[in-house]
């Protein structure tokens, strides 16, 4: 499968190998409402990167291992911590990082915020097969299993464009699956949405037009999937250098940002190079 974009469309947006704070093997990445790019590191640091990539700063730490992260409309950041088996919340008003929820979950991987329903959904990567997705009240942090699976390494997630369900990666299948919201808010039946995502899909992101992007831990590649269409290879770094095991992606206009678990930087990809393709 030929890639739509050459690797030259990607560049190192910010290099944190020797910086303070150090961008140590970032796994999660997200766009703040103010346009800045945030990422988490293997030592539990939550880092804010200026929109132009010229500087970055430490905003909080769990002293753990941060995975996926997401923002609510107020700019509060919810982040999954592998070491502590918990979800932490960085409060935009108080500037404090505090444990938000942990009930039942073993390997919290990726959070999706649903302010309309008042819940936080978090994938659990434990077990094969294992429990798929937990749900926590956004106000209290109380919650438990929402989608019991079985799933095979539930990983990155994204809210469906119509907000009627969640898309999530099953890395060990490998595929992208979909679970709808029932009328009462319960999880519906899981179905396969995108198959043959080789070899280890990890993160997801929807573009405003409904295009689904799927990044892979291995090999270092990103796919594009359009409803009713076929799976296409967007970009691949066969040397795993500019893109080195991109575990999560975030979109801002015509730019895509990837975390790189294999290195110490955030990558920026120019999607305008697609030229309408």
Can you annotate each of these PLM segments?
Residues 38-57:
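Beta-propeller domains
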Residues 49-54, 91-95, 137-141, 180-185, ...:
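Short loop/turn segments that connect beta-strands within beta-propeller blades
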Residues 11, 57-61, 98-102, 144-148, ...:
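Beta-propeller fold detector
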Residues 41-42, 82, 125-127, 171-172, ...:
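Short loop/turn segments immediately following the C-termini of beta-strands
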Residues 45-47, 86-88, 131-134, 175-177, ...:
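A short loop-to-beta-strand structural motif that recurs across blades of beta-propeller domains
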Residues 1-23:
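A short helix->beta-strand "capping" segment at the edge of beta-propeller domains
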Residues 18-34, 62-77, 81, 103-130, ...:
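Beta-rich, blade/repeat-based domains predominating
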Residues 175, 195-230:
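Loop/turn-rich, solvent-exposed surfaces of beta-rich toroidal or solenoidal domains
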């Amino acid at each position: 499968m030929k890639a739509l974009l050459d690797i030259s469309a990607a560049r190192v947006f910010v290099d944190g190998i020797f910086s303070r704070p150090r961008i140590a093997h970032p796994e999660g990445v997200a766009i703040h409402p103010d346009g800045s790019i945030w990422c988490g590191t293997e030592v539990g640091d939550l880092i804010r990167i200026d929109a132009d990539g010229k500087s970055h700063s430490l905003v909080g730490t769990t002293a753990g291992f941060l995975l996926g992260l997401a923002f609510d409309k107020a700019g509060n950041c919810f982040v999954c911590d592998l070491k502590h088996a918990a979800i932490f919340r960085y409060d935009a008003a108080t500037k404090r990082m505090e444990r938000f929820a942990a009930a039942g979950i073993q390997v919290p991987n990726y959070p999706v915020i649903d302010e309309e329903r008042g819940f936080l959904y978090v994938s659990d990567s434990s077990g094969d097969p294992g429990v798929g997705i937990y749900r926590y009240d956004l106000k209290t942090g109380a919650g438990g299993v929402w989608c019991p699976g079985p799933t095979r390494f539930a990983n990155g997630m994204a809210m469906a464009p119509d907000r009627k369900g969640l898309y999530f990666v099953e890395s060990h299948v490998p595929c992208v699956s979909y679970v709808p919201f029932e009328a009462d808010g319960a999880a519906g039946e899981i179905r396969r949405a995108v198959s043959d995502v080789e070899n280890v899909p990890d993160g997801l992101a929807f573009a405003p037009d409904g295009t689904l992007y799927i990044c892979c831990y291995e090999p270092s590649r990103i796919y594009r999937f359009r409803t009713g269409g076929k799976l296409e290879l967007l970009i691949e770094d066969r040397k795993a250098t500019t893109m080195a095991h991109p575990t999560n992606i975030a979109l801002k206009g015509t730019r895509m940002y990837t975390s790189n678990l294999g290195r110490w930087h955030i990558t920026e990809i120019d999607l305008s190079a697609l030229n309408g393709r």
